[in-house]
Amino acid sequence: MLAALALAQSYSFAVIGHTRGGPGNGTLPMERYDELVREVQRAAPNFVVLTGDLVYGDFEAKSVDRAAVEKDWDAVDAVFARFGCPVHRVPGNHDVWERTTLELWTSRYGALQKSFEHEGSQFLLLNSCWLPEAGSDAQCPPRFIRGVQLDAERRAFVERELAAAEEARHVFVFLGHVLWWDEDAAWWSEVHPLLEQANTRAVFSGDLGPWKFSHVERDGIDYVQSSVEFTVPPVEMRRNREAVRMLSEQLDNFALVRVDGDEVRIEIRTLGALESGRFTPATFRDVHEYDAGSFERKVWNRMDTPQKLVGWLWKLGLGAALGGALIGAVLTWILRRRA
């Protein structure tokens, strides 16, 4: 009997975030999906949790093309069905960002926040997306694309579910955004204390930014950001924007969590290291050394931090001011001599 119970409480699940294509509807990275499916099938989890940004969602369009977005949902759901196991979802800001996309989500997948039990553990699926007011045509403001802190209603859901699952052996939490990134984030004072009181083992998010992967441990809870970037930004963006380079130069990844009784082990699996062709010396040169030897690059190499740049600007400004003052003094002296 004990052996059977121990066997029943040994299971695994995968956590995968930001699998969307784009930009634009209908742009689906099928080659990368095929690799993802192979890796998930190889890991053979009992179920998968998808942590948001699963379709492009006609993001920022003035009027959402409902048929196009629904077609993309059909396409990605067909991919996810190939995992060969149950799939659970939380929304990202591309999935739900105005009234039409919200209606599509709820009609296909039900409530934005859910929980379920598996082998004595409790799993909380949370919504971290901005939502329009009922009947409003408003769209997600740019300042909220990284999510919103959980309001009183969403926190009440967490409290109820944790209270109902106080006997759970483990608690795992999933959401679309990295709401704990900043040290002064409301998450740490409003949500983390609730999770700390339960048997919470890990919290997972799937959004990009500032990295694809990050991890912090606090009070015995692992906070894991794990995501993929199947649509590579143009080379000009990678050359010109440090934030884009930091993302694109991390490997795509997903989490595989193995639970064996009281033991929880989180493994990070990578995607595209060999298959994508993105991590070659030629790619590095194309992004980082395309202007090697140029005057601009030589100047940049001398001032490769903001502090150095500001220091040089101060020196140049001070030099210009002193030079101007000296020229002014000389001209004044000459004019007085002639007077």
Q: Which residue stretches match the model-derived regions?
A:
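N-terminal active-site segment of His-dependent metallophosphoesterases
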Residues: 5-67, 160, 181
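Mobile, glycine- and charge-enriched loop segments
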Residues: 9-26, 30, 150, 154-185, ...
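Sec-dependent N-terminal signal peptides of Gram-negative exported proteins
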Residues: 1-7, 330
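A mature extracytoplasmic/lumenal domain signature
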Residues: 17-20, 127-130, 177, 227, ...
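Active-site glycine-centered loops adjacent to acidic/histidine catalytic or metal-binding residues
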Residues: 18, 52-53, 92-93, 176, ...
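Extended active-site neighborhood of metal-dependent phosphoesterases/phosphodiesterases
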Residues: 60-170, 190-202, 210-260, 264
